[in-house]
């Protein structure tokens, strides 16, 4: 490992639609091969689906919840108000996304520590920046593993599942916490 000084923190510019630095970092996490415009379309599309679903759940418990992926579903989605134009939908989508991220963020993780020929898994608390980074990474990773047809739907459903306390990203967080709890006896090796 290089023994140089720590790399300086780079400033992340907020995303153009929501003016949120958190969302800009999430778009960067979704991005593959430098295709930022594709990543923006995926994230904004997913937040659009999330806003519609939350509006339908809180508002009228009607027959159309945006589940149908066909053309009729697309027409119905647009009639409710797009996040690009509707300020309330935008705020609702961002709030739901932040709630999902908060629920996925881990508090502790285990790190390997070698002591006297044995390797121990030592539980350590995580800094806020790393918590957010892990939560973003897990949301994208487990959205990719889902079975929905498009990445927009996969990401939207993973965010909605995270808000409700289920889904792959939440399971990963619980596994990390369980591992830390199991190795609590080695907490005195913390450095």
From Swiss-Prot:
HAMAP family: Ribosomal_uS7_B (MF_00480_B). One of its GO terms (biological process) is translation. Pfam families: Ribosomal_S7. Residues 56-80 are annotated as: Disordered. Keywords: Ribonucleoprotein, Ribosomal protein, RNA-binding, rRNA-binding, tRNA-binding. NCBIfam families: rpsG_bact. The keyword rRNA-binding applies. Belongs to the universal ribosomal protein uS7 family. The keyword Nucleotide-binding does not apply. Part of the 30S ribosomal subunit. Contacts proteins S9 and S11. This is Small ribosomal subunit protein uS7. It comes from Coxiella burnetii (strain Dugway 5J108-111).
């Amino acid at each position: 490992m290089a023994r140089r000084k720590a790399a300086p923190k780079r400033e992340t510019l907020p995303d153009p639609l929501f003016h949120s630095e958190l969302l800009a970092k999430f778009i960067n996490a979704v991005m593959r091969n430098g295709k930022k415009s594709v990543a923006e379309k995926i994230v904004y599309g997913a937040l659009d689906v999330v806003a519609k679903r939350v509006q339908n759940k809180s508002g009228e418990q009607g027959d159309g919840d945006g589940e149908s992926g066909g053309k009729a579903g697309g027409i119905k989605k647009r009639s409710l108000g797009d996040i690009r134009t509707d300020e309330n939908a935008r705020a609702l989508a961002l709030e739901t996304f932040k709630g999902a991220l908060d629920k996925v963020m881990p508090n502790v993780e285990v790190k390997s520590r070698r002591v006297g020929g044995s390797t121990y898994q030592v539980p350590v608390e995580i800094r806020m920046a790393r918590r957010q980074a892990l939560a973003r990474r897990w949301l994208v990773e487990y959205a990719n593993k889902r079975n929905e047809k498009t990445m927009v739907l996969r990401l939207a459903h993973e965010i909605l599942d995270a808000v409700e306390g289920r889904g792959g990203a939440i399971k990963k967080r619980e596994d990390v916490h369980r591992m830390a709890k199991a190795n609590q006896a080695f907490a005195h090796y913390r450095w």
